[in-house]
A protein has these predicted regions:
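A short acidic, Gly/Pro-enriched loop at the edge of an enzyme's catalytic core
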Residues: 144-155
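Class I SAM-dependent methyltransferase Rossmann-like catalytic core
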Residues: 43, 48-68
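Conserved beta-strand signature within the Rossmann-like core of class I S-adenosyl-L-methionine
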Residues: 176-185
């Protein structure tokens, strides 16, 4: 399944490393993931989310606020794959593995999670080990240079992550599915209204997926009460707004102890042409 990020030859696991025929070797980390980022393009030590960001996101997600989304994603993926006895699923930009672990419940599916952050994939391994999940593998890798062979996957899933038209089309089998999850127009609107003078709805993401056709689109929304200042702050840290907000806006955020918000998501299912 894995290919060498240097020469694109097939990788084979030999003891505690992955090797290709051309002599390139990638050791399996103590946590159990493999680093397939090339230093020519990315510094594995600094790429993606740092350990503090991964920890904050993990603590928030593990409180269950986004559990309905994870279950809905598994439901949508399961319906697409219902006639496939042993599907291969790539979770591209898998983060700390919250959604990956839910997808692992799909029968005999084999799940491969990748993220550019080695801190994120290290936590993925911790998550699946604690849950007793055995059908997941994780690698530090880029969504724009996937370490997988051509036409090797039945499905790619991208949840709040970068989307690569060319790479997803390359790794998917003919007719393979791509599920993209993004914020709906009203996602967290109440939180924005509390922080900003003129809140606005989210604009639809445009991905330029000309190698795919859109099969279905679901707007999945529900309300959630965020019942502590720490959770509100952690949630805001997970959004793009965190880095664009003024000191005045951050002061308003820190004054919130409880807020009910709309959790809204667009779940789009595409099929490779």
């Amino acid at each position: 399944m894995y290919i060498c990020p240097v020469c694109k030859d097939k990788l084979k696991q030999i003891e505690n490393s992955w090797r290709c025929r051309n002599g390139h070797c990638f050791d399996i980390a103590r946590k159990g993931y493999v680093n397939l980022l090339t230093t020519a393009k990315h510094n594995p030590k600094t790429a993606g989310d740092n350990a503090e960001m991964v920890k904050a996101r993990t603590e928030f997600l593990d409180k269950g606020y986004y559990r309905p989304l994870a279950e809905k994603l598994r439901e949508v993926a399961g319906e697409v794959l219902k006639d496939n006895d042993s599907p291969v699923i790539i979770d591209s930009g898998c983060g700390e593995g919250f959604y990956t672990a839910e997808l692992a419940k799909l029968g005999k599916a084999r799940i491969f999670g990748i993220d550019i952050s080695k801190h994120a994939v290290a936590h993925c391994m911790t998550r699946v080990h604690l849950a007793g999940i055995t059908n997941c593998q994780f690698a530090a890798a880029s969504s724009f240079e996937l370490p997988f062979a051509d036409k090797s996957a039945d499905m790619v899933v991208s949840v709040f992550a970068p989307v690569s038209n060319d790479e997803y089309a390359r790794v998917l089998k003919k007719g393979g599915a791509l599920i993209v999850v993004s914020p709906s127009p009203r996602h967290l609107f109440e939180l924005k209204a509390a922080v900003y003078d003129e809140p606005y709805e989210n604009k639809p993401n445009v991905y330029g997926l000309n190698k795919f056709t859109l099969g279905s689109e679901v707007c999945f929304e529900y309300s959630a009460e965020i019942a502590s200042q720490a959770d509100i702050y952690s949630l805001f840290m997970m959004t793009p707004y965190f880095y664009k907000t003024s000191e005045e806006g951050m002061a308003r955020l820190r004054a919130l102890d409880d807020i009910e918000v709309t959790c809204g998501f667009m779940i789009q299912t595409y099929y490779k042409k």
